[in-house]
A protein has these predicted regions:
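Active-site anion-handling motifs in enzyme catalytic cores
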Residues: 1-358
């Protein structure tokens, strides 16, 4: 069955690209042709622009991009290479009309994963609901990004989701909200990165030349307390601190920032670090997959994304530590394996239903 995947395949963001890769690979392993929609809306092109001559950006940002261009160029090219080679993203388009036409060349569209239904990111349109498309629609691990729905989100849910044959989301709080509004069953499933096992991720990963004993630091939101925790843990355990940022926007004293790190290197750095310190959802997810020691404070904009994940897979905070520490290496895999199988069964069942019209 020719299946479209509607997600954030354009983002210069480790988690966004790796979840898209995982869903595409999982479908491929089940003999389903999963093709990622090459939709690259104008807001996203502006968001991820590195050229000072890009459209739709302010004068102040043009000046900043001009000063940063050569520093960011190599990092940007690493992401573009992954998008081209691993996601098979072809020529992009930006209009919703072109998206509609493209989706309708497929038998089914999977909306998700990532925060595709967070209108604070995507704007107020219905593109990521595949609105007005004459095609079968399901969602897999879509995220609203919050449990406090705004009026636009409520309106989108009421107007666009009834046409979906099956709906699954990533966070339990989102499922509760959708159930109240739609009065139908909403499944909670894990992010697509959990559809692939450790060995599959190891095959994709690429080594980085670093010291063998290190703490891996990855922030998408500045957090002074979390940084202090990382430095204290590293000092107590004789670890060097390596950090990455997808746009090279930050650099912290006492940390070695690595540049030109793509999604493949990101996986390797998490698996091989002695400890991971992060407020990122996907860095937390990969720390779970690779059973790492984890120092974690949730992102304040959407804390449920990580707290619900850790709770569902039975990972508890170590209360005997001075900082928010989780030793996933000591955790039982029972809950995680149960959630993974539940997620796979949902996806397998809905795809079979769409394929054979059950």
């Amino acid at each position: 069955m020719k299946t479209a995947i509607l997600t954030f395949q354009f983002a210069h963001n480790y988690g966004a690209l790796l979840q898209a890769y995982a869903l595409k690979q999982y479908l491929k392993s089940h003999d389903l042709e999963g093709e990622i929609a090459p939709y690259y809306p104008d807001w996203a092109q502006s968001e991820y622009a590195i050229s000072p001559f890009a459209k739709g950006i302010s004068f102040r940002r043009r000046v900043r991009l001009a000063s940063q261009y050569w520093k960011r160029k190599g990092q940007s090219e690493v992401f573009d290479k992954f998008i081209s080679e691993e996601l098979d993203a072809g020529d992009t388009f930006s209009s919703e009309l072109e998206l509609k036409k493209w989706l309708e060349t497929h038998e089914c569209v999977i909306c998700g994963s990532d925060q595709i239904w967070n209108n604070n990111i995507t704007g107020n349109g219905g593109a990521y609901f595949a609105v007005d498309c004459n095609v079968k629609k399901i969602s897999y691990a879509a995220s609203l990004g919050t449990t406090q729905l705004n009026e636009t989100q409520k309106s989108n849910i009421i107007n666009y989701l009834p046409s979906f044959s099956s709906i699954s989301v990533r966070e339990p709080g989102s499922a509760e909200q959708l159930t109240k509004i739609l009065h139908r069953e909403i499944q909670v499933v894990l992010d697509p990165v959990f559809l692939l096992d450790r060995d599959e991720w190891r095959k994709l990963s690429r080594p980085v030349s670093v010291d063998s004993n290190y703490l891996f630091l990855y922030f998408l939101q500045e957090n002074e307390k979390l940084l202090e925790c990382a430095k204290k843990y590293a000092e107590e355990n004789g670890l060097k601190i390596y950090e990455v940022h997808p746009t090279l926007a930050t650099r912290h004293n006492g940390c070695k920032r690595l540049e030109n790190v793509g999604p493949k290197e990101f996986i390797w750095l998490i698996e091989n670090g002695s400890c991971v310190c992060t407020n990122s959802f996907h860095a937390t997810a990969f720390s779970t997959i690779f059973r790492k020691k984890l120092i974690h404070i949730p992102n304040s904009k959407s804390p449920e994304r990580t707290t619900s994940l850790l709770e569902r897979v039975g990972i508890e905070l170590k209360t005997d530590k001075e900082f928010p520490f989780y030793d996933i290496s000591l955790c039982d895999d029972t809950n995680l394996n149960f959630e993974i199988e539940k997620s796979k069964k949902f996806l397998d069942a809905v795809m079979e239903s769409e394929q054979y019209g059950n």
